[in-house]
Amino acid sequence: GFPSSQTFIEIKTAETALAVHDGADECDCVLNVGAFLSGDYETCADEIEEIKAACADNPLKVILETGALKSAINIKRAAILAMYAGADFIKTSTGKIEVAATLEAAYVMCTAIKEYYDLTGTFIGFKAAGGIKTTAEAIDFYTVVREILGEDYIKQGLFRIGTSRLANLLVSDILGEDVKPF
């Protein structure tokens, strides 16, 4: 169902189970934004639960596609729904729509993660993805996570930045010269 989540749940679960069978050690799914924006939260939660079951013991990242959700309240509701339905990580974006990862979305999602942790004692990971192109932008997301969720979140198991360009930029910024090792 990537990137739009617009396929049947049977296809989504079959794809997930096949990926796990073929060796995937993590699974991603995209929130059914159409159902969510229509107020059909039950369908959204049911889909996440079924995909989580197909993941076996592997972590599930639920992509909220925050740019399509359009408001802080929708982002928070989607984050809470995803966590209670079984997400191990919540992720900002597929990177396939114009508005991808934003600091506002990161702030709202991290606040929801903190509230969820305070209520349940369960750590949920956060991944900023889509449109992060510079070291400075990555540092901004790092700062949001550190300030809201604390130092315990600044590790691979709980915080990630997804980008196709950033690794080379970071190495170049550290070394002070243009390099392309990745």
Annotate each PLM feature.
Residues 1-126, 133-164, 168, 172-182:
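Alpha/beta enzyme core
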